[in-house]
From Swiss-Prot:
Protein name per UniProt: Tudor domain-containing protein 5
Domain Tudor, chain residue ranges per copy: 525-584
Modified residues (Phosphoserine): 892
Biological source species: Homo sapiens (Human)
Task of the protein: Required during spermiogenesis to participate in the repression transposable elements and prevent their mobilization, which is essential for the germline integrity. Probably acts via the piRNA metabolic process, which mediates the repression of transposable elements during meiosis by forming complexes composed of piRNAs and Piwi proteins and govern the methylation and subsequent repression of transposons. Required for chromatoid body (CB) assembly.
Compartments (UniProt record): Cytoplasm
């Protein structure tokens, strides 16, 4: 028996004993108090997984019987078992002590005390009661400030209103029933901290959420109270939304009959009066259906009487005070179920009219009868009026409507509207008028193909630039097909936050009905590969999509370039994408888990399910390995726990995958890769900068770095086999003189053949065989590495012939007593770059020779090996001005013209000088030499990138994982692993 089962069994006995000893039973509050007095601890609800006492006792039907009590209370009585039947019969024969019961009620303040006439009907059956409007307004007032966790709800309610929230007073058994009854104003979102109660900002019909996998926008979509522009489609006061199959409510059909009977009376009215009458009819129907229908007609007349006394308008903040002065009674919006007076006025749009005038910070309320509405001229003004009628619940104010609505409607659309409005059946069939008007406008727009000027008719998004090898990034796994085929999204300020900002702007723009209708895509533009945007019906956010396939029945299959998944949407929901929303590259990156392959030919369902559980909806740390056929092969690590969890290790341990030392091309992406099909590539920012400056890109040096001798390849494979297979630790280390550690300093090597003079590198040479013998003698944690291409620093120019300038790097001889005793030969490294042809090729350019000198402190005497004329090098420190990477080659390789000549040497860099001198000389033909000495500051000596040393152990990143971004500020320290051409 587990610990939890033992606690539950003991709790059942204790609760039965408490309830049996009480003849009349106990309420849930009394049970909690009696248990605390008897045991000394509270009920172990959280340990057993319960959230309330009622939930606990309902899970014990053989121990507790729930009985309704007086005043809507709940009484808990015990159900005796075989061993307690005798005790229960003795307790039942006892006399009931009325004095004790009365003293118990007097001793504690009861929420049910009061006259019998005010007691509620006992709660019977399983049908939850209705939450009173006063309580609902209190809940809205509490959650309007900020969301509240369910565990902190009682504390927050007591702090706000000075009393505890007694839900049983209203006939509810638990908070679950309260939240279900208030589901129209409160939404519950599951978070890591628990259930989060949030105030719904809209009040339309709630629908199940079905957005692309991994997105963080989880608020449900509901209609706003008082916002009638998004109510029933037929009852909208604007003529802009196309409607196909409409089933009008019964109330609207009755209004149709009323309007038919009044055809004779209204036939003499002019065109403008007919439109005004139609608009007022719609408003009255909406008011009866909406929240205003709950207000009594007597109260409406009183409010209208107060407002009518101010023909020039009454400030909305003074409405309650004027009402109290006239009728000598208070008007409380909260008792009517409204959050404030503004929401109350917005619900009474059939009798009140609201305006906002410049120069006033408050809204003006008018009597709808005495303040006639201005004549209807366009859809724009009608939409503005609908927005003004309910300002607190509408996300767009009047000023926002004026800014976001398309301000320049075409003349071609105005003329058909005027012609259609002249039809004689305008008043007789108002619903048909709206449908025909919308259809005519839509057909006209499609016929003329009048698209907005800032819409994107034919354009492709750019992909994110390739990531640097061995860089650490924070990622979200958005869409998973298999461990070899999934999409990630980078978690950083330059990617995820920009995407969120763009989606908020898109929602703000396209949520305006006039703007949304203006950007409707005609049928002729709906073609595969077209970039557009869509709002899925279950969500309230707008997404960038690319049309993948055109299906039957007015449906299309679209690809989400920011999340990686494919979905089916309606053609009518597609909208043109504004040009400003195409600047952000597609955020989804196709990936494959590095170094793994399935045990069988394909991934099993268990392996895919395990990989989905590992990813979850949380930020992970990704270690970039390489790109294979344009697909990023990446290691994934979960750092949320105390120990780092590498996904490829977990899949191998559970028998789902085989770990190999190479990356296999993904079969799924080779069959279909929508991102590569519909987007264009974008070069890395560093390569673009280098190309603009006239220098070769990093890829050029990387390609040159591949050209190594066969002997060097074999040597490197020997080193690679000796490197431990564990993943490296994730601590970041800066390279500086003050914290230098020579145990893991990379051994530098010289460059072999190079096609371009700019690709020659300056390093000290290494003895081929001695180099590796030294590595074996070193401790296991000290490994030989070569600097990769990602250590390039744009602030330094590559050596060689750059823009007609010759660059030489010298190491001056430093005279000292220690050098004479050790007999160490100092070398001078010089690059010969066909100087004779430079003057003829570039006669107008003056030759310069740059000499880079570095002051160093000499080390102790070196150790020479027997039978070897060359001295074994240990660690070599390059200047921080080293422009590019180096490659280890054999010393016996052929040295062509233009290569680096050097001799063996020993440099033990225990301490470096705190200054670096850069000397510039003019051409040797000039007798005068101008020298400029630059002393680099301490900040310049430290490398501008963070490096991570390799080790067999791993360390938890913790919060540092959130700092890993796509800027490649974190790098593994260089490895000898190479990519074959």
């Amino acid at each position: 028996m587990s610990e939890q089962e033992r606690i539950q069994e003991c709790l059942r006995k204790e609760i039965r004993s408490l309830l049996i000893s009480t003849k009349d039973g106990l309420s849930p509050q009394e049970l909690e108090k009696e248990y605390l007095l008897m045991v000394g601890n509270h009920l172990p609800l959280r340990i057993l997984g319960y959230r309330s006492t009622m939930e606990l006792v309902l899970d014990m039907p053989d121990v507790v019987r729930v009985c309704p009590g007086a005043g809507g209370t709940v009484i808990l009585k015990a159900i005796p078992d075989e061993s307690t039947k005798g005790i229960a019969s003795l307790v039942a024969k006892q006399r009931s002590s009325h004095k004790l019961r009365n003293s118990m009620h007097k001793g504690r303040p009861s929420i049910y005390s009061g006259p019998r006439s005010h007691r509620r009907v006992p709660y019977r059956g399983r049908v939850a009661p209705i939450l009173p409007a006063v309580v609902k307004s209190e809940l809205k007032d509490l959650l309007a400030l900020s969301p509240v966790l369910l565990s902190d709800f009682e504390k927050a309610f007591a702090k706000r209103f000075g009393r505890s929230f007694q839900y049983m007073q209203y006939g509810f058994l638990s908070m679950f029933e309260v939240l279900n009854a208030a589901s129209d104003v409160i939404s519950v979102e599951q978070t890591r901290a628990g259930s989060l109660l949030m105030l719904k900002k809209s009040v339309t019909e709630e629908k199940p959420r079905g957005c692309p996998a991994g997105k963080i926008f989880t608020q449900p979509f509901r209609m706003k109270q008082g916002s009638y522009s998004t109510g029933f489609p037929v009852a909208k006061p604007c003529f802009s939304q196309p409607t196909s199959n409409m089933e009008p409510p019964k109330q609207i059909m009755s209004m149709e009959k009323t309007s038919k009977l009044n055809v004779v009376e209204t036939s003499r009215l002019n065109h403008t009066e007919k439109l005004n009458q139609l608009e007022n009819t719609f408003k009255s129907v909406i008011a009866q259906i909406g929240p205003g229908g709950t207000i009594s007609s007597e109260l409406k007349h009183k409010i209208k009487f107060v407002v009518s006394k101010f023909p020039e308008g009454l400030f909305i903040s003074k409405l309650l005070g004027e009402y109290e002065v006239i009728f000598k009674e208070q008007l409380s919006p909260k008792k009517l179920g409204f959050l404030n007076v503004t929401e109350l006025v917005g619900a009474l749009s059939d009798i009140l009219h609201v305006e906002f005038r410049k120069g006033h910070q408050d809204l003006l309320v008018f009597d709808a009868d005495k303040k006639p509405l201005p004549p209807v001229q366009s859809d724009k003004k009608i939409e503005a009026k609908a927005c003004v009628s309910s300002p607190p619940r509408n996300s767009l104010s009047t000023a926002a409507v004026k800014e976001t609505v398309w301000n320049c409607p075409s003349k071609k659309q105005k003329e058909p509207q005027q012609k259609i409005c002249k039809k004689p059946n305008l008043v007789v069939k108002p619903l048909q008028l709206q449908v025909e008007t919308n259809k005519s406008e839509l057909n006209l727009a499609m016929a003329n193909h009048d698209i907005p000027p800032d819409a994107v008719p034919n354009k492709k998004l750019c992909r994110l630039p390739p990531l640097d090898t061995s860089s650490l990034i924070g990622v979200f796994v958005e869409y998973i097909i298999s461990p070899s085929q999934f999409y990630i999204r980078i978690y950083s300020r330059d990617s995820s936050e920009l995407l969120e900002d763009m989606m908020i702007e898109m929602r703000r723009c396209y949520s305006n009905q006039l703007v949304s209708d203006r950007y409707v895509m005609p049928e002729c533009f709906i073609q595969p590969g077209h970039l557009c945007c869509v709002r899925i019906s279950e969500d309230k956010w707008w997404y960038r999509v690319i049309i993948h396939r055109v299906l039957e029945k007015q449906e299309v299959e679209v690809f989400y370039p920011d999340f990686g998944n494919i979905g089916i949407v309606q053609k009518s929901s597609l909208r043109f994408l504004k040009c400003c929303y195409t600047k952000l590259p597609a955020q989804a990156i196709p990936c494959s888990l590095a170094w793994v392959r399935p045990v069988e030919e394909h991934w099993t369902s268990k392996a895919i399910l395990q990989f989905q559980k590992l990813c979850g909806l949380k930020p992970l740390v990704g270690v970039v390995d390489e790109y294979v056929d344009g697909i990023l092969n990446i290691f994934l690590c979960d750092t949320s726990s105390n120990e780092d969890v590498y996904f490829h290790h977990v899949l191998r341990t559970e028998g789902h995958a085989i770990v190999c030392r190479e990356n296999i091309s993904s079969k799924g992406f080779s069959e279909l890769n929508p991102l590569a099909l519909y987007t264009t590539s974008s070069g890395g920012p560093e390569d673009i900068v280098l190309t603009e400056l006239g220098y070769p890109s990093q890829q050029h040096y990387f390609n040159e770095d591949r050209k190594i001798s066969p002997q060097s390849k074999e040597s490197e494979l020997r080193i690679l086999d000796e490197i431990p297979t564990g993943m490296p630790c994730l601590e970041s280390v800066t390279i500086g003189d003050d914290i230098w550690d020579e145990n893991w300093l990379p051994l530098q090597a010289k460059m072999g053949k190079g096609g371009d003079a700019a690709s020659h590198l300056f390093t000290a040479s290494l003895g081929g065989k001695n180099q590796y013998s030294s590595c074996k003698e070193m401790p296991q944690k000290d490994w030989c590495f070569s600097t990769p291409k990602d250590t390039w620093d744009d602030s330094w120019q590559p050596s060689g012939l750059v823009n007609g300038t010759k660059v030489e790097v010298h190491k001056p001889e430093v005279l000292g007593a220690q050098e004479k005793n050790t007999g160490t030969n100092r070398t001078q490294k010089q690059l010969d770059i066909n100087g004779s042809s430079d003057s003829s090729t570039l006669p107008k350019l003056e030759e310069f020779c740059t000499s880079l000198t570095q002051s160093e402190q000499s080390a102790d005497g070196s150790q020479s090996e027997p039978n070897n004329s060359q001295t074994q090098p240990k660690q070599i420190q390059l200047s921080t001005a080293a422009p590019c990477s180096t490659t280890a080659v054999d010393d016996s390789a052929e040295k062509p013209s233009g290569s680096v000549e050097s001799s063996p040497e020993i440099l033990k860099n225990e301490d470096f000088s705190s200054s670096r001198a850069i000397t510039l000389y003019k051409d040797k033909r000039q007798e005068s030499v101008d020298q400029l000495s630059l002393i680099l500051s301490y900040e310049c000596q430290i490398s501008q990138k963070l490096y991570i040393p390799r080790s067999t152990a791993t360390a938890a990143l913790g919060a540092a994982a959130r700092l890993a971004t796509s800027r490649s500020l974190l790098h593994w320290y260089p490895s000898v692993k190479r990519m074959e051409a």
